[in-house]
Amino acid sequence: MVVVTRASTLGPRSALGAVILLHVLFMLGPPVVQTDIFGYLMYGRLGVLHDLVPYTHVANDVPYDPVRLNVGWKHFPSPYGPLFTLFTYVLAPLPVIVAIGVLKVGTAVASLGAVALTWSCARRLGRPALPAALFVGLNPLLLIWGVGAAHNDLFMLVLVLAGVRLALADRDALAGVAAVAAGAVKTTSGLVLPFMLIGAHRRGRLLAGALLAVALLAVASLVAFGVDGIRGMVATVIAQGRLVSGHSVPNDLFRAFGANRLPPGLRPIFPVIFAVVLALLLRRTWRGSDWVTNAGWATLALLMTLTFLMPWYVVWLLPLAALADTERLRWATLAFTAFLVAGRAIVLLT
């Protein structure tokens, strides 16, 4: 935050050059902090090389595949959206090292694209562009777990920001298409869409674009994965929502009061809390409050009520906080980043 607050004293070339350099360095390093990249490849190989639907089959169904050994979630079907899964189908025929390289380069480019779009959105909103871009591009979790580990959240992020930028330019139909495309990478990005819809000048066009994208994705999913695949996709997303990670706000809250972990019977409380906060923020947006800022607060509320939380999930929030009309959201985002760093440090040290 010190760098961001002093951005006015930095030259844009040197500051953005540092962002690009850090992205290149983390892109060139091996994906040592997470194994999700092998899961991405495995789901594509299930579909293309083994003729199995990745929403109804798991890595352990093909024990002889060499990628399976490095997959972390060997018993779990793909939790990712159809657009990303179809992208992994393209990678499946490639040699593994080449496919990893494509994902590493792709996520780095997507992250830099998100930085560039944050800059562009800030200028459109009349807000300082360089601090907003640095707030996103210099976040350590984005660099280490996003770019370094090649997480697909960065593909989702650049599509979300494309939708935001298009909405700010009153290109509402295309904004709806981009927002749905982001949700077809990871469903959590769909949270931005209702705020975007309320804030749009031509809501009907945005809704039409979104519905068209949904229809096209539904047809593509039906052709590629079949009815059982679509059912499996929905079931897996629901199942993932019931998981509990070692560190999350709900889990750590109960640990602070002496419990070993979040009691199963109390897990439904947190989705209810999020639903209430979401309803209040949507109402506030309907009454004229800034929709980008409220989408940011809603994303923070989602992250704080998830029972399954990973460090790189903070990238969902970064650009919305950077573009917000209040410093409070940026400070809250930094505090949440510190919480995630502390939680991961505890895991690594124990």
Which role fits each region the language model picked out?
Residues 1-235, 241-244, 251, 255-257, ...:
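Multi-pass membrane glycosyltransferase architecture that uses lipid-linked
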Residues 259-262:
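Membrane-interfacial helix-loop-helix junctions in multi-pass membrane proteins
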